[in-house]
C-alpha cells in the first residue's frame, strides 16, 4: 500500500500525473508477458494494473477477453500468475502492482488465503471488479489485514452515499470510471469528471485514476486537467499485443512507442 503513497508524493513533487498500463498476466505466454511488463516499465509506466486470466470476465470488452483466451491457450494458471508477480516484484522493488480481477478467483483460493498470497508476492492493491461496495466487507477486511489496498470503482453516476463509502473504504487509489459499460479503447472516454473528482477530494478518498477507454495522450492530459491523479489504459495496450502476436520484438517496440507519449502527457 505504501508504494502508492510514495508514488503519488513523488509525482506531485515533479508536477506529473501517473500513467498506468493494464495487461493480462501470461498473455500471450509467460515469457513474453514478463518482457511486456519490463518494456512497459522501461517506457515510463508509473505502476502496473494486471489481470489474472478468468473464464468469465463480465466487465471486459472483447479485446481483454481475447487476452484471457490467449493466456488460457498458453496454459497459464492462477498459481503461475503468482509466481510471475513474485518475479516482477523482485525485479522492480518500488513500482506499485495492482490486480484487477473477479471474485471467483478470490473465492477459489479462500478470501484470506488469497490476500495472504498477494502480500507474500508483493502485490499492493486488488480491485475485485464484480463485488459492489456494499458487499465488499470480507474482501476489504482481508485486504487490510494483509497490507493490501482495497480498490473501489467510482462510476460516473455515483451518488453522495457511494462517494462517501468509496472514500471511507478505499486505499491506494480510486478507480474512476470514464463511463458505464464494458472496457474498450473504441469507446472513447467521455467528458472529464470534475465534479466527482472534487467530491472525492472533499471526502479524502484515495487519489482518483481515470480508466476505461483511455487510448490517446490527449485523454490522459484531459483526465489530469480534470483533477485525476493519473490515467489507466488497458484495451489500447492489449490491442497492440494482439496486433503483433506473431512478432514479439515488433510488439515490444510498438508498446514502447505507445507508452512514451502517454507518459509524456502526464507532465504539465
Swiss-Prot record:
CDD domains: Tryptophan_synthase_alpha. One of its GO terms (molecular function) is tryptophan synthase activity. It comes from the Bacteria. Pathway: Amino-acid biosynthesis; L-tryptophan biosynthesis; L-tryptophan from chorismate: step 5/5. One of its GO terms (cellular component) is cytosol. It catalyses: (1S,2R)-1-C-(indol-3-yl)glycerol 3-phosphate + L-serine = D-glyceraldehyde 3-phosphate + L-tryptophan + H2O. Signal peptide: none annotated. The keyword NAD does not apply. Tetramer of two alpha and two beta chains. Belongs to the TrpA family. This is Tryptophan synthase alpha chain. The gene is trpA.
Amino acid at each position: 500500500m505504501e508504494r502508492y503513497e510514495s508514488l503519488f508524493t513523488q509525482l506531485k513533487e515533479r508536477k506529473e500525473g501517473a500513467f498506468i498500463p493494464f495487461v493480462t498476466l501470461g498473455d500471450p505466454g509467460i515469457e513474453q508477458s514478463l518482457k511486456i511488463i519490463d518494456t512497459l516499465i522501461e517506457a515510463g509506466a508509473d505502476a502496473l494494473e494486471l489481470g489474472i486470466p478468468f473464464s468469465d470476465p463480465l466487465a471486459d470488452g472483447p479485446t481483454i477477453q481475447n487476452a484471457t483466451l490467449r493466456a488460457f491457450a498458453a496454459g497459464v494458471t492462477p498459481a503461475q500468475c503468482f509466481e510471475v508477480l513474485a518475479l516482477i516484484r523482485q525485479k522492480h522493488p518500488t513500482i506499485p502492482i495492482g490486480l484487477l480481477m473477479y471474485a471467483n478467483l478470490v473465492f477459489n483460493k479462500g478470501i484470506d488465503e488469497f490476500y495472504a498470497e498477494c502480500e507474500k508476492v508483493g502485490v499492493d492493491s486488488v480491485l475485485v471488479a464484480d463485488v459492489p461496495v456494499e458487499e465488499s466487507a470480507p474482501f476489504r477486511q482481508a485486504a487490510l489485514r494483509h497490507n493490501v489496498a482495497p480498490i473501489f470503482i467510482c462510476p460516473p453516476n455515483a451518488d453522495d452515499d457511494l462517494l462517501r463509502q468509496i472514500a471511507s473504504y478505499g486505499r491506494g487509489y480510486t478507480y474512476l470510471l470514464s463511463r458505464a459499460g464494458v472496457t474498450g479503447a473504441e469507446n472513447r472516454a467521455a467528458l472529464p469528471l470534475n465534479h466527482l473528482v472534487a467530491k472525492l477530494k472533499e471526502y479524502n478518498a484515495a487519489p482518483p485514476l481515470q480508466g476505461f477507454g483511455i487510448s490517446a495522450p490527449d485523454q490522459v492530459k484531459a483526465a489530469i486537467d480534470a483533477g485525476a491523479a493519473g490515467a489507466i489504459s488497458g484495451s489500447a495496450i492489449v490491442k497492440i499485443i494482439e496486433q503483433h502476436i506473431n512478432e514479439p520484438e515488433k510488439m515490444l517496440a510498438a508498446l514502447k512507442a505507445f507508452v512514451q507519449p502517454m507518459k509524456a502527457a502526464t507532465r504539465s
